[in-house]
Amino acid sequence: MKNTLNFLSSALMVALFMLISTAVSAQTTRDEFMSKWQNSKQFTLDVLDKMPDSGMDYKTDPAAMSFKEQIHHIGNAMVGISQGYLKGGDPGFTIDLATASKADLAAFVGKSYDYAAATMKALSDADAGESIEVFGNNVTRRQVMALLMDHSTHHRGSAIAYLRVEGVEPPAFVGF
C-alpha cells in the first residue's frame, strides 16, 4: 500500500510539473512572439519615416500599390484579419487614405499593430489552438498570428524596395 501511495504521489507530481511547464512554455512562446511583433511595428514605422513626402505616391508599376498604399495595406490587413479570425472587436479607428498625411498614416499603422497585439494577447490558449477555416485552409489561430507577421514582412519588404528606387537608404534591419 505504501509503495502504491508513493508511486501515485510521484506520478501526480510529474503530471503537475508537466502541466505547469506546458503552460509556462506556451506563455513564453507568446511573449517572444509579441516582443518580435513590437520590433516589426517599429521597423515598419521606421520604413515609413524614411520615405520623403514626395515619394509617398510612387508606384513601381501602374498596376502596383503605391508606397503609401503598401504601408496602409499592412495596417488595414492586420485590423481586418484580427477582426475576422482572431476574435477582435471594433478597433475604434479608421483612416481616409486619400487625404491622409504621412503622420496620419504612421498613427494608423501604429494603432493597427497595437490593436492586433491586444487582440492576440486576449486569445486564450484554447482559442489560439482552435482550428478555423481561413482563405480555404484549415489552420489554427496561432497560424493566423504568424500569417500577420509574414504579411507585414512581405509588404514592408516591398516598401523597402520603393525606398531604394527613390534613392533613399532604408533603415537598418534590427532582428530583436
PLM regions with names:
Residues 1-28:
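Bacterial Sec-dependent N-terminal signal peptides
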Residues 19, 51, 127, 169:
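Residue-level signal for pocket-adjacent positions within structured domains
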Residues 16-18, 27, 86-91, 103, ...:
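Short hydrophobic/aromatic-rich motifs at helix boundaries and adjacent loops
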Residues 34-38, 42-45, 53-94, 133-176:
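Short, contiguous alpha-helical
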Residues 47, 100-133, 139-154:
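Acidic/histidine-rich alpha-helical segments that form the ligand environment
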